[in-house]
Amino acid sequence: LIKELVNMVIQHAEEEEVKELKNPCECPRALHRVCGSDGNTYSNPCMLNCAKHEGNPDLVQVHKGPCDEHDHDFEDPCKCDNKFEPVCGDDQITYLNLCHLECATFTTSPGVEVAYEGECHAETTNAMEVLFQGNPCECPRALHRVCGSDGNTYSNPCMLTCAKHEGNPDLVQVHEGPCDEHDHDFEDTCQCDDTFQPVCGDDEITYRNLCHLECATFTTSPGVEVKHEGECHPETKVNQLILKSCMCPKIYKPVCGTDGRTYPNICVLKCHISSNPGLGLAHLGECKVAVLAKETGEVRNPCNCFRNFNPVCGTDGKTYGNLCMLGCAAETKVPGLKLLHNGRCLPKEQL
């Protein structure tokens, strides 16, 4: 009799297993609670597996038993920002930062570990092609609003990256938090027409029109100014393809070059150094007002500012778009103006 009961139990278990293989949501009513990585308690492992198949493919079991308040720490393993602090995984893929690598252990690359800090070596993989593995629009539902350079607010950095891949390749994050009325000033930095009214930049490159030159100050040629109207003279024109071999992220993490120009990030500076061996790093952060170039003794225009919105408050009680813009005002409009603090001025500070 005992043997028959054991056989019946085994047969029932096998039937349940077959059912689960046929339809993952045909689950027994047995109460055997487990905690999911989304912070929810499921009646049994089969119910968790059902939820996984019904729209939450990254769901995994955290532990047996119901979830408690601490288990919510496991929600959204892919809630990562887009700060460029690359790490190379032992799968020879460059990840945007450590968080993105840890996210991959839950999604595309289970068990991946850090091989070393920095981008993977060029001979192993093209770093910029693999910063976002899989579908860039498979985003967590986490609410961590960011403001895009198109003036739109995105639910989180992943949603902004999705929009970038879906038809807006020049889109970048301006700042964390929702956009406000001032952020629309930064829309469409490089939306230029093709009218041929050439100008020659002081980088000896001919630009199709003034708008294209101004666009270059945000992308390939930070700090470039108009040398004269019309095309550059052929004998002085330099190779315009120098920078095409440099694949740099469109992240604004400014550094100051020894030529007195502010570069959007260290990668762009290194790219310019490759064609200008005398150029070097002066310091991290934007160049100070009227930096004296070491090689030429030339004083750069203090109003060659990027339009990234990183507000600062001046001692005049006014909010400036970024530190460079405050420096420009100090040199041209408000002598003696200094930085009061980072961030917008408070109402009580406004004069």
UniProtKB/Swiss-Prot annotation:
GO terms for cellular component: extracellular region. GO terms for molecular function: serine-type endopeptidase inhibitor activity. The record marks R141, A142 as: Reactive bond. The keyword Lipid metabolism does not apply. The keyword Secreted applies. This is Serine protease inhibitor dipetalogastin. It holds the Pfam family Kazal_1. Disulfide bonds join C25-C50, C27-C46, C35-C67, C78-C103, C80-C99, C88-C120, C137-C162, C139-C158, C147-C179, C190-C215, C192-C211, C200-C232, C246-C271, C248-C267, C256-C287, C303-C328, C305-C324, C313-C345. Residues 19-69, 72-122, 131-181, 184-234, 240-289, 297-347 form the Kazal-like domain. Thrombin inhibitor. Prevents blood clotting to allow insect to feed on blood. Also functions as an inhibitor of trypsin and plasmin. One of its GO terms (biological process) is negative regulation of coagulation.
